[in-house]
């Protein structure tokens, strides 16, 4: 089994899509070197290498800074230095013929990707819709040996341009960990919030249609909206917040909801094409979900209650609250979430990438 180097945009604690792909690779028996964004030597020292979980190791390299990328000669020198640091760390943990994974969000690492291309099979992860024209996005695809995309609409657009090197990658939910430890009493932070609870278990930033949410909650003061973070989504008495939870504790929050609520602002093209893990995390417990009509989930319209306006979403929430506890829709949602588990993702990665020892770059 070949191993993997992951050039991450984030840090492991975010537990987002890229981190779950690392976990899926580790399930296959790959060793994964998870490279956090480089630390500028002007700002401090890189974090030391550490074990994250079985088979996954975190590493942070040192860089002079992003401004060097504005000078071609210095840019190439810094990319070569970063590559050398990464290879040294890969040798330290004994990686075998590793594939390199990267995303198009990392525009500043394009020179590093070009350097890594000389020695590695390159896997480009296209995780979100591209709502603006950026030539670097195409350059990242061109550098790759395989581009794996999650939004189905982007998959068809890219495949029409680049052919069979573009493959579809399913969104994944950590189904086993999410559902494994949900026994016991409801968390105290939830008990104080009246029912019915409609919840968006993330930070309610600009991706949500906040004016629409405010209109809905004003019209239905008996419904209580729950989000995560320090600040309420809207300044209303029936809007509530929960503290951030560890991934293994998130299931307790989801079980405490009556309805999952995803009122994304679909006037923004990026949101319209979203493939949120929050949808699948709610599905893992079978609870009904109300959402604005995200393109990727149109095929699940019989399992999701949809609406565009405040009035339509209010009707959708009421229909979701009225869904019988023994509705067959609940079992179907759970089965869909299980189909998007890390184990299923691992099987897809094994099928679509040259991970066997005998594979050649």
Language-model-derived ranges and their functions:
Residues 1-45, 217-218:
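N-terminal subdomain of nucleotide-sugar transferases
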Residues 175-256, 279, 307-309:
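Conserved catalytic-core segment of nucleotide-activated headgroup transferases in glycan assembly
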Residues 13-16, 248, 252-253, 262-283, ...:
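Nucleotide-sugar-dependent
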Residues 324-355:
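A charged, aromatic-enriched C-terminal amphipathic alpha-helix characteristic of glycosyltransferases
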Residues 153, 171-175:
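Carbohydrate-associated surface elements
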Residues 87-91, 115, 128-147, 154-155:
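Membrane-proximal helix-turn-helix segments that form the acceptor-binding/catalytic region
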Residues 244, 303-311, 318-325:
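Conserved acidic donor-binding segment of nucleotide-sugar-dependent glycosyltransferases
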Residues 29, 258, 286:
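A short alpha->beta transition loop at the rim of the catalytic pocket in nucleotide-sugar-dependent
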């Amino acid at each position: 089994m070949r191993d993997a180097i992951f050039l991450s945009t984030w840090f492991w604690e975010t537990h987002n899509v890229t981190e779950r792909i690392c976990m899926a690779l580790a399930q296959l028996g790959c060793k994964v070197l998870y490279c956090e964004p480089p630390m500028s030597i002007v700002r401090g020292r890189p974090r030391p290498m550490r074990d994250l979980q079985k088979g996954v190791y975190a590493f942070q390299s040192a860089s002079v800074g992003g401004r060097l990328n504005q000078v071609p000669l210095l840019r190439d020198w810094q990319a070569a230095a970063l590559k050398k640091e990464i290879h040294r760390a890969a040798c330290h943990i004994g990686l075998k013929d590793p594939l390199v994974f990267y995303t198009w969000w990392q525009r500043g690492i394009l020179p590093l990707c070009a350097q890594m291309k000389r020695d590695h099979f390159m896997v480009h992860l296209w995780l979100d819709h591209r709502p603006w024209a950026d030539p670097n996005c195409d350059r990242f695809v061109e550098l790759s040996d395989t581009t794996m995309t999650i939004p189905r609409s982007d998959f068809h657009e890219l495949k029409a341009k680049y052919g069979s090197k573009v493959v579809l990658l399913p969104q994944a939910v950590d189904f086993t960990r999410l559902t494994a430890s949900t026994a016991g009493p409801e968390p105290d932070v939830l008990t104080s919030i009246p029912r019915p609870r409609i919840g968006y278990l993330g930070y309610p930033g600009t991706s949500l249609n906040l004016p629409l949410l405010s209109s809905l909650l004003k019209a239905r003061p008996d419904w209580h909206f729950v989000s995560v973070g320090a600040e309420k989504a809207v300044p209303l008495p029936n809007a509530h917040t929960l503290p951030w939870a560890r991934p293994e504790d998130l299931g307790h929050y989801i079980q405490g909801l009556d309805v999952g609520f995803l009122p994304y602002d679909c006037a923004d093209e990026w949101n319209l094409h979203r493939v949120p893990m929050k949808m699948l995390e709610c599905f893992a417990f079978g609870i009904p979900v109300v959402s604005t009509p995200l393109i990727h989930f149109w095929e699940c319209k019989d399992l999701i209650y949809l609406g565009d306006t405040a009035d339509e979403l209010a009707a959708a929430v009421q229909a979701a609250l009225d869904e019988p506890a023994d509705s067959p829709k609940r079992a179907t949602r759970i089965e869909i979430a299980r189909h998007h588990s890390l184990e299923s993702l691992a099987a897809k990665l094994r099928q679509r990438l040259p991970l066997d020892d005998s594979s050649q770059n």
